[in-house]
Swiss-Prot record:
One of the primary rRNA binding proteins, it binds specifically to the 5'-end of 16S ribosomal RNA. Belongs to the universal ribosomal protein uS17 family. This is Small ribosomal subunit protein uS17. Keywords: Ribonucleoprotein, Ribosomal protein, RNA-binding, rRNA-binding. GO terms for cellular component: cytosolic small ribosomal subunit. One of its GO terms (biological process) is translation. GO terms for molecular function: rRNA binding; structural constituent of ribosome. The keyword rRNA processing does not apply. PANTHER family: 40S RIBOSOMAL PROTEIN S11 FAMILY MEMBER, SMALL RIBOSOMAL SUBUNIT PROTEIN US17M. Pfam families: Ribosomal_S17 (PF00366). The keyword Cytoplasm does not apply. Part of the 30S ribosomal subunit.
Length: 87
């Protein structure tokens, strides 16, 4: 048997990069309403570690779960999927 754990990853959009080495990522998921059956978009914000401060607000990123790095930060930047266009 393998002792390797499955690493959780999330894809979302960066909504804040104001903190040093930390980004806030908004992750959207669709859930079905228990009574009406309509699909609703729910948003969860997670703080992720960005060692080189390379991500800007509006970028689409993939983050992976890691050991707790602070009180609120348990995710780290895995890769940048899409850069936001600079206007």
């Amino acid at each position: 048997m393998t002792d390797e754990k499955r690493v959780r990853t999330l894809q979302g959009k960066v909504v804040s990069d104001k903190m040093d080495k930390t980004i806030t990522v908004a992750v959207e998921r669709r859930v079905k309403h228990p009574v009406y059956g309509k699909y609703i978009t729910r948003t969860t914000k997670v703080h992720a570690h960005d060692e080189e401060n390379q991500v800007k607000a509006g970028d689409t990123v993939i983050v992976r779960e890691c050991r707790p790095l602070s009180k609120n930060k348990s995710w780290t930047l895995e890769e940048i999927v899409d850069r936001a266009t600079v206007v």
